[in-house]
Curated annotation (Swiss-Prot):
One of its GO terms (cellular component) is endoplasmic reticulum. Expressed in leaves, stems, flowers, siliques and roots, especially in the vasculature. It comes from Arabidopsis thaliana (Mouse-ear cress). InterPro entries: DMP (IPR007770). The lineage of its organism: Eukaryota, Viridiplantae, Streptophyta, Embryophyta, Tracheophyta. The chain crosses the membrane at residues 37-57, 69-89, 129-149, 167-187. This is Protein DMP7. It comes from the Eukaryota. Involved in membrane remodeling. Keywords: Endoplasmic reticulum, Membrane, Transmembrane, Transmembrane helix.
Amino acid sequence: MEETKQSLIASLPSAPRKPKSKVERVVRKTFKGTAHLSNLLPTGSVMSFQIMCPVLTHQGQCPTITSRWLTCFLVSLCAISCFLFSFTDSIRDPNGKVRYGLATWSGLLVMDGSITLTEEEKEKYKLKILDFIHAIMSMLVFFAVSMFDQNVTRCLFPVPSEETKEILTSLPFVIGVICGAFFLAFPTRRHGIGSPLTKE
């Protein structure tokens, strides 16, 4: 009985696809672009921050000046790693193994030096000005994420004024909107360390 149902379903003609309206295409493109936002921040940097922040800030208490300095150092170090990881990329070698490298002005410098790239591949992986803009925006997004963290804000601003509170709530939102719009308009083509490699 079940086999008969399956064969009947398989034999039904598929309904013709209705062409998508302009609004549907825009919405689809927006959602597709939003998927690229996951590449904004290296997961390792964010995870390191989330693990170490409560420890270094003593759950936001920061009892000593050393705690505050260590918190500033952690935020700066993670932001710098977001900047640097923006210049990493990956490629599949002829055996299908993923190789990571650093984008340079002359192409991709594969970290273990096991493969040499063709001239066409070198051109594809060259460092561009847009990579620097992505790196700076990645740092800004990380600073916005860290400003939303209650441990950081309580540590660095234990008794904030009304003006400081306003800045701490609105600035990360503004940074997120501007950087998000930029990344949707100009998505990164790099698949760095911690980012998934597509079949392209």
